[in-house]
Amino acid sequence: MTHATEDVVGAEGSADERARQVEQQMTDEERFSLVISIFGWAPRMFPTKDPRIPDGTNMSAGYTPGVPRLGIPAIQSSDASMGVTNPGYRPDDPGATAFPSLIALGSSFNPSLVREGGEAIGREARSRGFNVQLAGGCNLARDPRNGRNFEYYSEDPYLSAVLAAEQVNGIQSQGVTSTLKHFSLNCNETNRHWLDARIDPDAHREADLLAFQIAIERSHPGAIMSGYNKINGEYAGGNGHLLNDVLKGAWGYPGYVMSDWGATLSWDFALKGLDQESGVQGDMVFWGKEPFTDDLRQAYADGKLPEERLHDMVLRILRSLFAVGADQWGPAPEVDLDRYHAIALQGARQGIVLLKNDGALPLAADQPLKVALIGGFAQEGVASGTGSGAVNPVGGFADVVPIGGAGIMGGSRNLFLFRPSPLELLKKALPQAKLDFDPGYTPAEAAMTAKRNDVVVAFAVRVEGEGYDNADLSLPWGQDAMIDAVAAANPNTIVVLETGNPTSMPWRDKVQAIVQAWYPGQAGAQAIAEILTGAVNPSGRLPITFPESLDQTPRPQLPGHGTPWGTAVTIDYNEGAEIGYRWMAKTGAQPMYAFGHGLSYTSFEYSDLTVTGGETVTAMFTVTNTGDRAGGDVPQLYLTDAAGEKRMRLLGFERVELEPGQSRQVTLTADPRLLARYDGTASQWRVAAGTHRVALARAANDEQASAEVELTGYLFGS
């Protein structure tokens, strides 16, 4: 893929100098125009186009006028992390590549693949005139009910950081600024505008903030988007400690902080570190004003907003545009939709996780099987998540099923289905088989279909998305009962799940195989068919823990769920940094399926583990494919004990592709912060001196080898 801006990307010194030179020539009126963005015309939310957007402007998620006399381009942004979206306000848009959900890409454990997807998204964004992509979902999947988990990579800070950074790197390589979002603790959707997320500050640094810190260091995103929620009583967009002291102070972040749409409550958020109010009409809807328009100007006139702060806000925005070369664009680049589809297909293939297989898979493509396909809209397409990140694919959706709901996001809550359908692709993949389809609307009819066939593939979907959390982990619309009835009628049942989160699976012991397909994007049906028939060997690994029940989680009951829209909610994240697999290790609970779990049609063996210490841990080992098929594996290195303290941390991983009998040596070196505790009194990280135990594992609860190593005690970083 052509990197059109290699001469300017990363040229931070020249970007800083140019920003200073240009900013000095701006008028205050031009400066104020740069610190807001105007939500593009969306008929579902705003019936008329905002008059501040010039006629002929390509409508976008956010528009900020440029300053042509100084070479400053207009800023036009688009959602999001799974492709360039079109949420209802570009009727002539041809559609874009719909990549797999981020949690599916998280299951790939493949940074280079995520980078390729980011490059494609950046190029498609640029071809449409968007120079800011609202991508880089870096929140941690703390709660398996969070409706937006499909927009995030994982529950682990390190895995999330590495993958989010590569998406940002890919996007920005195309001359498009990328965000990293949502800073921070935007981990539940229930009444998110009124949610106060409470957490111990040191634990926050070791988990959610560490994910952002590592991702920023690895990718230098042009913008950080704040969340809707409060953190310890202060709104994310006006949290001076997090924005000024941590992000811009301790970490030295040089880019700009934008609010989420409708998340700026007051002009004084500018004093607390917010540089741009995004989607100003959203603030008018929620709070009855646009704080960075009249209020900010008045504060400046009254001397409450210092001149140097206004200059700093503008400098940060200019610097980010210039750093990627967004001011030097030539003609719109050509896009290669076939190549992008191939990237999306590879993401779906590597993101699908085989959770269980009692010999039912792969299906024999050359056998005259009678196969029942039941449920999950498998005759129409594969499911996608909802909200601002939903991508309108080239050629449009196979179907859009309205769901609705309370609150401002109710109108965009739909079941989106991408063509082609699993039914169509499985017919091609099983040319000797006779396929028998039932929609799965009633358990009795589904059971009759199951009984008259050799094997059953039952599909199940769940609608999840922005603005809503799930009440529990069950499947909607009676699908658990349907699967239970089908499995009772024909034990040779395979279940394919298209969801954005773990599910409860009360029928788990009654079926022969379970495939977690997530929301697999526009190429999902092909990937599912290839996995089921063995054309592709499954290699995905879970980036989120699947609990046996919500009783194993820190909050069996979700605070505020079911309360009216607009209700103030407080969530105490008392688990601190012990999220997901870390919580399971701390409590001794055994999950249904552990973080890192995933089966294959081949087998792998680990050997020759050697570990060295000092200031960090370096592990070397050999991975061998001991089976008869080529396949991908993801060996994982964990800290399990730190100088006598039981502590579970993913230290590293590497995806390896091996032919039968092939071996490869892997070396993993841990970021020292993963071995440390954050010491808030010293404002530094502290590694404890002494013996540390590390484990080489297939999953968080599946150790294959372990070793002890001595580490030097020391303070470092910030």
What are these regions (language model features)?
Residues M1-Y678, Q684-N701, E708, L715-S718:
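Glycoside hydrolase catalytic-domain context in secreted enzymes
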